[in-house]
């Protein structure tokens, strides 16, 4: 399955809030980070100009938000609809970002909630933990 990234628009906000609630609420609850609808909306709107919808076969299946810094790409959020999880789409998006970074001699960084099993995917793709805080592992690829 192939995908394309399309810049999110204000018309996508409802989808993005619902996607975030569907994909993040359980992990946030386990971490003790309880978030209401307003909190989810606030997170969606942070760096909104760097938010991209993940589309395949004319269907929107998720989103990725990343910052392209001079020395690295920082993945702020990656969320895939539940019915498309475990089908390799998250892997493909992360591999795309790793390749984008390598083309510019950069590395990729991200933070993942300690309760989120996506950490295993990131490790399989070459990420390693370089730091952590109370809630998250901070991970990076090699440059």
Regions picked out by a protein language model, each given a short descriptive name:
Residues 1-11, 141-143:
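Conserved N-terminal entry element of GNAT/NAT acetyltransferase domains
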Residues 86-99, 124:
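Conserved acetyl-CoA-binding loop-helix of GNAT-fold acetyltransferases
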Residues 101-113:
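Conserved GNAT acetyl-CoA-binding A-motif
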Residues 110-119, 135-142:
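Conserved beta-strand-loop-alpha-helix junction that forms the acyl-donor binding cleft
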Residues 78-85, 112-113:
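A short, internal acetyl-CoA/4′-phosphopantetheine-binding micro-motif in the GNAT/acyltransferase core
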């Amino acid at each position: 399955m192939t995908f394309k990234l399309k810049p999110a628009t204000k018309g996508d906000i409802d989808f993005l809030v619902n996607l975030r609630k569907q994909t993040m609420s359980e992990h946030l609850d386990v971490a003790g980070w309880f978030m209401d609808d307003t909190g989810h909306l606030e997170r969606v709107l942070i760096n909104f100009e760097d938010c991209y919808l993940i589309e395949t076969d004319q269907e929107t299946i998720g989103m990725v938000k990343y910052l392209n810094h001079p020395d690295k790409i920082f993945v702020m959020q990656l969320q895939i609809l539940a019915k498309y999880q475990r089908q390799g789409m998250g892997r493909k998006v992360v591999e795309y970002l790793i390749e984008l970074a390598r083309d510019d001699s950069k590395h990729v960084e991200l933070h993942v909630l300690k309760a989120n099993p996506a950490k295993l995917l990131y490790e399989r793709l070459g990420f390693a933990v370089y730091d952590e805080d109370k809630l998250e592992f901070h991970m990076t690829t090699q440059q």
